[in-house]
Amino acid sequence: MLHFKTIALLSSVTLIGCTSSPHAWQGQSGSKRVFIELETTPEGTSQAFLSLPEQWIDKAKADTLVLSDESILAIFNRENIRFEGSFHSGKDSIQAEVTTYGKTREFALGKVDSLQPIYFAQNPRPPYPYRSEEVTYVSCDSIQVAGTLTIPQGKGPFPAAIIISGTGKQDRDGTFSGHKPFFKIADYLTRQGFIVLRADDRGTGKTNGIYEEATTSDFARDAQAGINYLKQRPETDTKHIGVIGHSEGGQVALMLGADSPDVSFVISLAGVGVDGLQILKLQNDAILRTTPGMTPERVYQFMSLFNTLFDKVHSVPLEQPLDIPLRQAFDQWVAQQDEATLKAVNFNDGKDEMFFSRYLHQAQGRWYREMINYDPENYIPRIHKPVLALNGDKDIMVPAKENLESIKQLLDKGGNTQYKIVELPGLNHMFQRCKECTREEIPDLEDVFSKEALQIMGDWLRENVQKDRK
């Protein structure tokens, strides 16, 4: 805890040594930025304004401000925020503790002129030893896809790859909380001599369309449209075009590896290797087990409910409505539970009906129903080209053991001997070296994308793609 020489709390005081122009400092802790400004009014009183961009707080004015040559305390009543810090290096920096929503983070702030973008050291930065182009192409349903094409220096043609994103609307860089993993992959591979195409998802960035109305099959068609675009580029070696997919994008990559004659290699990054019903069960079980305060008994109780619902959705033919059979399965499960179990899964005070309504809405969607009926046996045994499958052993979204094992078994079933499967220790679903390895931790980790995973990809591509071109 930081301490102060003064104990009086005043709503406004004169800022020692400050002029009428504002002074500003900014710091970052994980994926959270803090930006504080101190300024003096014409009447000579001092004011503090705080911005927390990732928490949608912009220039909140301090209700209480205590300043000295050594320290600052600013309290923001409405937002229930406390900023407590000590000045260093002639007030060029502040070591601070910022408390929001009952949680305290430590920040090292430096003096700035204005709010700066969120920063992660592993994100690529210029100058880049390659050419970048903003490109557009048309997919099915007249979707206008926008993306970035990176082209190596030198004389082509070059082998090429398209990066395919996972579940959820993502921009071309795969941006989450300031991390840009797809940009990092593209930067690395382009430096290794590959053309790389990465694109905004439907309804994201500069790509039109409605993401929520699309299915995995639609995403596969969007990726094929990107491959078709690559084939038209004179810099592309059309005999060596590959797909690199993350999570659901890994599933799409495996589908295209089976169905598209244009694909010459496949890289699955935490890609789904089991059927849709199993991935739902594996994922929810893994997430629950890593949730703070979740006991094994409560995991069992939640999974009993979830598995009942998943099994029912999976059993209903796609052309038939879900509402009645799902309602019956849900009511039957509730009727069979004791009061302790219903309380454990938060089914009290009408919350059971709220839960059912939300789940029914999700389960009735085209994407969900196609996903839960996905069967990798329809695709992976038909892949007869080089495949690299990577997973982190701390992945709770696409658990590594079961998914990698299934990919291997299905490749073997089809007679494919050109594959490499690697389970990477200590990495989560986003290929970050994790600590607690929970979903909540992901945004705050410094890793953007594992250097080890990139090295494996680069080595494998040299051996299986670039060597083959010579």
Predicted stretch roles:
Residues 213-234:
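Alpha/beta-hydrolase active-site loop
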Residues 175-196:
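Short amphipathic alpha-helix adjacent to the substrate-entry channel of hydrolases
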Residues 383, 389-391, 395:
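Short beta-strand/loop motif that positions the catalytic acidic residue
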Residues 30, 114-156:
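N-terminal cap/lid segment of alpha/beta-hydrolase-fold proteins
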Residues 157-167:
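Short beta-strand element of the alpha/beta-hydrolase
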Residues 269-381:
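Accessory cap/linker subdomain of secreted extracellular hydrolases
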Residues 396-402:
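Conserved alpha/beta-hydrolase "acid-adjacent" motif
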Residues 22-87, 93-100, 182:
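Central antiparallel beta-sheet cores of small beta-barrel/beta-sandwich binding domains
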